[in-house]
Amino acid sequence: MARDYYEILGVARDADKEEIKQAYRRLARKYHPDVNKEPGAEERFKEINRAYEVLSEPETRARYDRFGPEGVSGAGVGFQDMSDMGGFADIFESIFSGFAGGGMGGPTQQRRRGGPARGDDLRLDLKLDFREAVFGGEKEIRISHLETCETCSGSGAKPGTRPRTCSTCSGSGQVRRVTRTPFGSFTQVSTCPTCNGTGMVIEDKCDTCDGKGTNQVTKKLKITIPAGVDNGTRLRIKDEGDAGQRGGPPGDLYVYLFVNEDEEFQRDGINVISEIKVSYLQAILGCRLEVNTVDGPVELIIPAGTQPNTVMKLENRGVPRLGNPVSRGDHLLTVLIDIPTKVIPEERELLEKLAKIKGDRTGKGGLEGFLGNLFK
């Protein structure tokens, strides 16, 4: 028993025309044979098309609602009616305008049968060291992509010959079969089996590319990494994707950047973050220290009385702003105070004198206060 057309599209029986169209778009995209290679997808796609043919037209829908499948048996929308219904032609153009993608990249522009087709975009993931991401620079990468065959100039035909127009479809890439019924004519359009939709037939294939018009080539490229890139930054390398078909333009290469962690530095936006350890005496008395930055060693002044976890700022020592490298973030250093667990006798004696001067109470458990742990 044939499935209910409303059930096939997943809509209610009182669904309006727009709801039916949206359901068809969603299902056609999911089950189109060029996208879904699972067993049964093609039959499901035909089933979806048939349901939409009937339910998208008020006349055939009314007959279906009244008489069921028998009322529309063999009926359909003729090819000449597509411009009036505003359905299949527009829907297929919008649904599949992004298909024909693939490779490492995402979708590319729509391929037109028999005409030039843009090559696929490609994706490459590239890891950078922390400082490479901060300052940028030139980087050499290796890619593998399709290039137009130099022997046949992309035609796929042996030099001295040329592809001929397909006699089966007259170069359209499609074949149509018209079925006439008491309810009207039904036109079924499918890909030409002779030329596989290209509209051309190659009788003498190029020996270099075996008729494909392209060859897989591995090559090295030098690319420029801008200063200030971060995880997920995407660089577009124009025309370094796969070669186009039948004279179409090549796709692009998209390089996605990922930054390795650094042992010393971290990053928060355009600020660099690190830690610095000082002794308790340096924290109390203050000092000058040499600290590491992404630019190299610089002098940092630790003020007297610096407290644990104080954040010191080195202005303009951070990451250049992407697209405006003159503007830079800051380097933020968290001060960690190193308090020893044991001290030598001479140091202990001096600290006990200091504790008495400060009025800190001493005892068996050690000093209470800032220096307490030193006397355990």
Swiss-Prot record:
Intracellular or extracellular location(s): Cytoplasm
A cellular component term (GO) from this record? cytoplasm
Q: Which cofactor does it need?
A: Zn(2+)
Q: Which residues are noted in the entry as Zn(2+) 1-binding?
A: 149, 152, 206, 209
Provide the cofactor note recorded for this chain's UniProt entry.
Binds 2 Zn(2+) ions per monomer.
- The CXXCXGXG motif repeat ranges on this chain: 149-156, 166-173, 192-199, 206-213
Return the SMART domains for the record: DnaJ (SM00271)
Segments carrying the region annotation (Disordered) are 102-121
- A biological process term (GO) from this entry: chaperone cofactor-dependent protein refolding
Q: Where are the zinc fingers (CR-type)?
A: 136-218
Ranges annotated as spanning the membrane: none
Every copy of the J domain together lies at: 4-68
Q: Where does Zn(2+) 2 bind?
A: 166, 169, 192, 195
- PROSITE patterns (UniProt xref): DNAJ_2, ZF_CR
One of the entry's Gene Ontology molecular-function terms is: ATP binding
UniProt cross-references to PANTHER family, sorted A to Z: CHAPERONE PROTEIN DNAJ A6, CHLOROPLASTIC, DNAJ HOMOLOG 1, MITOCHONDRIAL-RELATED
Q: Relate the assembly described in the record.
A: Homodimer.
What does this protein do, in the record's words? Participates actively in the response to hyperosmotic and heat shock by preventing the aggregation of stress-denatured proteins and by disaggregating proteins, also in an autonomous, DnaK-independent fashion. Unfolded proteins bind initially to DnaJ; upon interaction with the DnaJ-bound protein, DnaK hydrolyzes its bound ATP, resulting in the formation of a stable complex. GrpE releases ADP from DnaK; ATP binding to DnaK triggers the release of the substrate protein, thus completing the reaction cycle.
**What is the protein name for this chain?**
Chaperone protein DnaJ
